[in-house]
Amino acid sequence: MQSDSAPLPRVEYVFETSKFRMTSRANEARLRLTNECPILVRPHEPFIMPTGIHFTRTPSCAFILTGETDKDVFCHTGLIDGGYRGEIQVILLNKRKYPVTLYRGELNICLSAFNYVLPPLRDVSFLTPPMYANDAGFDVMVMHSMVIPPTTDQPFMIYLGVETPGPPEPHVALALGRSGLASRGIVIDVSEWGPRGLQLKFYNYSGQPWLAQPGSRICQIVFVERRHILKGFKKCLRHRKLAPGVRFREARVHFREDTNSVRKHTHEDNPVHEPNVATASADIRGTKGLGSSGF
């Protein structure tokens, strides 16, 4: 455990946008953004909103992207891998049959760091290991075809009656949605994989049935340090509620704006610290995907 006197791990970023304003307090252990302009979210049309945030330096951790609004809009809880260097984007989905507008100040975005482990798993047929260096999630694949109908009021539920295959204490296996599916209208509630199995709650806001073929990746599993998931008396500590029963407390890191890397407004300029596509190693994520899983 890190002592209070030790310097905090540093996360450096650049922030270039007029669509959000930074609302984090000084020395806050997370980044907070609030929308500056109206956002129109139409039914059955996932809205991918650039935040203007690019990480240029990250310690050995990953990040969770969360969104909050009082409107009838589902904000995809995104996994941002430590090796991702593209622009971080939030995915919004309309839960109703009519357009919903988020006016100035009605959408709050948070980026929080967490520590994780990649355990050597025993043979689990429906889990595949991370694809890139510094990726945090194991993909969950379906073994048989299934159809997720359009969501009305109730989620489409899948139960995997398999004990969590990861290490025991001090880690918790969390199921998170894939950004590639969220960009097509398919999202899940964050859930904990326990000794009795894993329950997945899917929401299909695309307006069309979605067919998952055998081998399709439907979500991802992250083995999070247990101290990030508050239980018992610790639930009284400050936290973010990722889902009913899942109370998340971020890692203590120092977010600092990278003044040495200034993102230009012109499309001709090379993005900050992003690997050149022609020379980047195949095992580096770089700008691929939306932070974790890709399209």
From Swiss-Prot:
Name of this protein: Deoxyuridine 5'-triphosphate nucleotidohydrolase
Alphabetically ordered keywords of this record: Hydrolase, Magnesium, Metal-binding, Nucleotide metabolism
Single Gene Ontology BP annotation: dUTP metabolic process
Co-factor(s): Mg(2+)
Pfam family, one: dUTPase
Disulfide-bonded cysteines: none
Binding sites annotated in the UniProt record for substrate: 178-180
Family statement: Belongs to the dUTPase family.
